[in-house]
Curated annotation (Swiss-Prot):
SUPFAM superfamilies: Metalloproteases ('zincins'), catalytic domain
Entry's localization field: Cytoplasm
EC number(s) recorded for this UniProt protein: 3.1.-.-
Principal location listed in the UniProt entry: cytoplasm
Source organism, top-level taxon: Bacteria
Name of the protein in its database record: Endoribonuclease YbeY
PANTHER family (UniProt xref): ENDORIBONUCLEASE YBEY, CHLOROPLASTIC (PTHR46986:SF1)
GO cellular component: cytoplasm
Keyword list, A-Z: Cytoplasm, Endonuclease, Hydrolase, Metal-binding, Nuclease, Ribosome biogenesis, rRNA processing, Zinc
GO biological process, one term: rRNA processing
Residue positions binding Zn(2+): 120, 124, 130
Pfam family, one: YbeY
Cofactors required: Zn(2+)
């Protein structure tokens, strides 16, 4: 895979090598052509808030956004999958400032949160979504499976990034993330007991 990272956030603590590793692994597991290209943009809260409004008409910053370029179906290495050739998959945009707040609430570190969000963004590039409940369950289950398998792969290779977290928020269901989103929105609005709605 050809993956470029552009860190425009000025944020310390972002392991770019780890982000490339987890994205490469996820794409490989999804049978995407090994010469496919993608990019990861790491931005500040103001930048992702602008993108959030421009593309989704939603106010405020968010954790991850994806901008697919080529429509393709996973299955490059399947006998019946054909060989579509290399593709420019698109861009994943991450906001570590926002992600760190989520990580703290979920009980793990920023690096794990960014790995999780990178896999989430990767699946969006490949056409997965979570608009309908069935889609949501499928996407989050696959996200957690890929992330857990990546940790196992890293361990087999003897590579050290962050330790694999074991807390309940480390491999969240869609309901877990919705609850986290609602908690953060309520706190930002100064209403810790109330909940709102958020879309990624």
């Amino acid at each position: 895979m050809s993956i470029e990272v552009f860190n425009e956030s000025g944020y310390d603590g972002v392991n770019e090598e780890m982000l490339i590793d987890v994205l490469s692994f996820a794409l490989g597991e999804m049978d995407i052509h090994p010469d496919a290209e993608a990019s990861i943009h790491i931005v500040d809260s103001d930048t992702i808030a602008e993108l959030h409004v421009k593309w989704l008409d939603l106010e405020g910053p968010t954790d991850v956004m994806s901008f697919p370029m080529d429509e393709l179906t996973p299955g490059y290495s399947r006998p019946d999958g054909g060989a579509p050739g290399p593709a420019m998959l698109g861009d994943i945009v991450l906001c570590p400032e926002f992600a760190e707040k989520q990580a703290t609430k979920a009980g793990h570190d920023l690096s794990h949160e960014l790995a999780l969000l990178t896999v989430h963004g990767c699946l969006h590039l490949l056409g997965y979504d979570h608009v309908e409940p069935a889609q949501e369950r499928e996407m989050f289950a696959l996200q957690n499976e890929l992330l857990a398998d990546w940790y196992d792969d890293v361990d087999r290779r003897g590579v050290v990034y962050q330790p694999k977290p074991t807390g309940p928020g480390a491999f969240p269901t869609a309901a877990d993330r919705l609850e986290l989103d609602q908690t953060m929105i309520a706190e930002e609005q100064g209403e810790p007991g109330e909940s709102g709605a958020s879309a990624r």
